[in-house]
A protein has these predicted regions:
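Amphipathic alpha-helical assembly/interaction segments
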Residues: 1-140
Length: 140
């Protein structure tokens, strides 16, 4: 993140690549899912939430303020968690073979952990910066 008012989390280019890679893997996964009613319904949900993680992370990287960054990263966290949920269902309902999903589910878990850590860091940095302000100062 180039704006010095926003927190520096994990490497921005790396996370952009990772979130986009997950989106691409999801697109390939859903093409391999059965064309049943359940398969199509789950595929649609997985595509929406899984690609949304990458799109919303890109938006967070362009946040105008720390508050905006935190809000956008909250959306990334929610979408990543929903993606994980939707990825669990095809495996548990035996729509896909058990070995197809562990790697992508692991990556989703890692992205959630990174996102949560980034949000916590941003909140902590915001709090420490506001503590440095002098109350009722003419400089504020």
């Amino acid at each position: 993140m180039r704006n010095t008012e926003r927190p520096e989390a994990a490497s921005e280019p790396d996370l952009k690549k990772r979130t986009k890679a997950v989106a691409l893997r999801i697109l390939k996964l859903v093409d391999a899912m059965p064309k049943t009613t359940a398969g199509r319904a789950l595929a649609s949900r997985i595509v929406r939430s899984g690609t949304s993680v990458a799109a919303n992370y890109r938006a967070a990287c362009r946040a105008k303020s720390t508050a905006d960054f935190i809000a956008k990263m909250g959306i990334v966290e929610e979408e990543a968690d929903q993606t994980l949920f939707w990825l669990e269902l095809p495996e548990e309902s035996e729509l896909v073979t058990a070995g197809k999903l562990p790697a992508i589910k692991q990556e989703a878990n890692e992205l959630i952990a990174i996102t949560v850590a980034s949000i916590k860091t941003a909140r902590r940095n915001r709090s420490s910066h506001s503590a440095l302000r002098i109350p009722n100062s003419a400089l504020e």
